[in-house]
Amino acid sequence: MQQLQNVIESAFERRADITPANVDAVTREAVNQVIALLDSGELRVAEKINGEWVTHQWLKKAVLLSFRINDNQVIEGAESRYFDKVPMKFANYDEARFQKEGFRVVPPAAVRQGAFIARNTVLMPSYVNIGAYVDEGTMVDTWATVGSCAQIGKNVHLSGGVGIGGVLEPLQANPTIIEDNCFIGARSEVVEGVIVEEGSVISMGVYIGQSTKIYDRETGEVFYGRVPAGSVVVSGNLPSKDGSYSLYCAVIVKKVDAKTRGKVGINELLRTID
């Protein structure tokens, strides 16, 4: 694996000079191997090690290199044709392989090659970009998008129209992460490498980036880039110091533990916020 990483790191340093016409065989093979390993879930761009999320930057670099070494090509679809550098993940799947891997894909859901989809996942008509990791038991609902290299945990519900930001455009240092057992409400956006920690519930229409204030109304504490575990979050506003205006924020209205969350439905958690 170290040799593979060395090839990727070296090629990335000279990426501006690499084209599909001049890329060497060693680099092409290394990039293709990494994409295949990301596709199968054997590698992932970020993982939790000793309780902390670690981003493997070289894997992200391999994803970026894949755009340098490949030409656009015609991609056949059921209703149309497409023209892109990245093949579709399920292009060569047959019924036996779908049965073996154990997830559902509802047309016209689109998943790019290099994204991992775990067992018991349901993909409604949605989009999952290259390098993303979607873990077991997760629902990606209609028109939700999972951005490049985003990490989605087990038993997550991404509601209709949710946007989970990617790392490629604009270029971000770390992927957006939704940990296990989270619920992200309809039309919410979580971007720019924000981490939503385990068991959190995000109401509909909440927008969180690195500069968004995440205000805990019980403690007065303000977080940036991280929603603490077990938070129930709604959209809100905080006043300026002189009270002349207010700016958007996300508000943690309560905290719930796994026991409470197991007893109470998501809708009830969001309705009883006073």
Curated annotation (Swiss-Prot):
One of its GO terms (molecular function) is 2,3,4,5-tetrahydropyridine-2,6-dicarboxylate N-succinyltransferase activity. It holds the Pfam family THDPS_N_2. One of its GO terms (cellular component) is cytoplasm. It catalyses: (S)-2,3,4,5-tetrahydrodipicolinate + succinyl-CoA + H2O = (S)-2-succinylamino-6-oxoheptanedioate + CoA. Its EC number is 2.3.1.117. Signal peptide: none annotated. Its main location: cytoplasm. It is an enzyme of class 2 (transferase). Substrate binds at residues 104, 141. Keywords: Acyltransferase, Amino-acid biosynthesis, Cytoplasm, Diaminopimelate biosynthesis, Lysine biosynthesis, Repeat, Transferase. SUPFAM superfamilies: Trimeric LpxA-like enzymes. GO terms for biological process: diaminopimelate biosynthetic process; lysine biosynthetic process via diaminopimelate. Pathway: Amino-acid biosynthesis; L-lysine biosynthesis via DAP pathway; LL-2,6-diaminopimelate from (S)-tetrahydrodipicolinate (succinylase route): step 1/3. The keyword Phosphoprotein does not apply. It is found in: Cytoplasm. CDD domains: LbH_THP_succinylT (cd03350). NCBIfam families: dapD, PRK11830.1. Belongs to the transferase hexapeptide repeat family. Homotrimer. This is 2,3,4,5-tetrahydropyridine-2,6-dicarboxylate N-succinyltransferase. It comes from Cronobacter sakazakii (strain ATCC BAA-894) (Enterobacter sakazakii).
